[in-house]
């Protein structure tokens, strides 16, 4: 098992911030919350290594320049010197065009028994992004409390500051209880989900406990270009089911722009989704959790047939594509694709 915890959008969803690098004596292990575990040999300062199976570069800081002719030489030179020269930072990218994922560590409030100065942790987390033009995103993580280590602030290269509002399962359950109480006292208020169905904690997954921390809203807090014209509502808002699954997304006008439905027996298994103003797209699965049919009432639908080394995709016009695969389990890869038109 690899560290693949439920992320800030709930089970079944991945976010770039979920990337994590384990630093061991004999290996470097890059994990995401999709369960991928990419192993590298330990790196010397400034050294770079490439994973062919994942098309991913990993580079350790500690060198001002990469050798002439190196695939990443120009992209490396676009980084600020303090990042390039730090041997304690690691950087990952899947393209010579960028962007870089900057892997560092978050500050935390030391405990009463901690020895100071505290050593660096045996892992790295995403602390920022940088593209080949020098534009950056910097992530700020909570240093203490229930949200310690979670991203609660982002600053972009233009100096705009964003606040990420995170909620716990207990907070969402309390809000559900308040809404239910209000609905009982006012017959005109829509009846919310039963508070008894909204637990204060969530069950664990095969990878470990689900802390129930979810992203609820994104606010613009500072804009150097328009400091007096900040919006009075969040740029985006997210709601969740009683099981912590992403239920709906709202834009800054409080208009619902996305909606999702899940299988009650399989947390995080999405069976339908819808964009605002569009018909609902539905999915059917087999007993192993693979999608076997995608149903679109206003367009093309698809059927998926899984065989040992091939996946056949047939649309509702009876056109067929075939994906040929090699390998097994988590190392299975598509090696050839037959298109419907040859």
Predicted features along the sequence, with ranges:
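Extended charged/polar low-complexity repeat regions
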Residues: 9-16, 26-342
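Phosphate-centric recognition/catalysis
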Residues: 23
């Amino acid at each position: 098992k690899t560290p693949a915890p439920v992320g800030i959008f709930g089970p079944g969803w991945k976010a770039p911030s979920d990337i994590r690098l384990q630093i061991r004596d004999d290996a470097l292990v890059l994990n995401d919350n999709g369960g991928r575990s990419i192993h590298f040999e330990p790196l010397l300062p400034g050294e770079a290594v490439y994973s062919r199976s994942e098309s991913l570069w990993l580079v350790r800081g500690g060198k001002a320049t990469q050798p002439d002719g190196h695939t990443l030489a120009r992209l490396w030179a676009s980084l600020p010197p303090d990042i390039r020269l730090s041997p304690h930072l690691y950087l990952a990218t899947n393209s010579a065009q960028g962007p870089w994922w900057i892997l560092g560590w978050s500050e935390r409030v030391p405990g009463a028994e901690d020895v100071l100065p505290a050593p660096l942790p045996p892992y790295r987390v995403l602390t920022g992004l940088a593209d080949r033009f020098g534009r950056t995103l910097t992530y700020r993580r909570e240093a203490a409390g229930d949200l310690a280590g979670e991203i609660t602030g982002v600053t972009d290269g233009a100096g705009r500051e964003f606040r990420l509002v995170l909620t716990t399962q207990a907070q969402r359950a309390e809000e559900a209880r308040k809404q239910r109480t209000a609905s009982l006292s006012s017959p005109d208020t829509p009846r919310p989900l039963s508070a008894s169905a909204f637990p204060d904690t969530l069950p664990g997954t095969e990878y470990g406990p689900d802390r129930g921390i979810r992203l609820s809203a994104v606010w613009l807090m500072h804009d150097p270009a328009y400091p007096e014209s900040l919006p009075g509502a969040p740029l985006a808002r997210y709601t969740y089911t009683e099981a912590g699954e992403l239920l709906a997304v709202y834009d800054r006008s409080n208009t619902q722009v996305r909606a999702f439905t899940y299988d009650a027996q399989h947390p995080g298994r999405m069976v339908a989704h819808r964009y605002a103003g569009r018909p609902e797209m539905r999915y059917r699965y087999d007993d192993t959790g693979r999608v076997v049919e995608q149903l679109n009432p206003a367009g093309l639908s698809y059927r998926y047939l899984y065989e040992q080394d091939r996946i056949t995709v047939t649309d509702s016009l009876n056109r067929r594509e075939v994906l040929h695969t090699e390998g097994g389990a988590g190392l299975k890869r598509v090696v050839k694709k037959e298109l419907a038109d040859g």
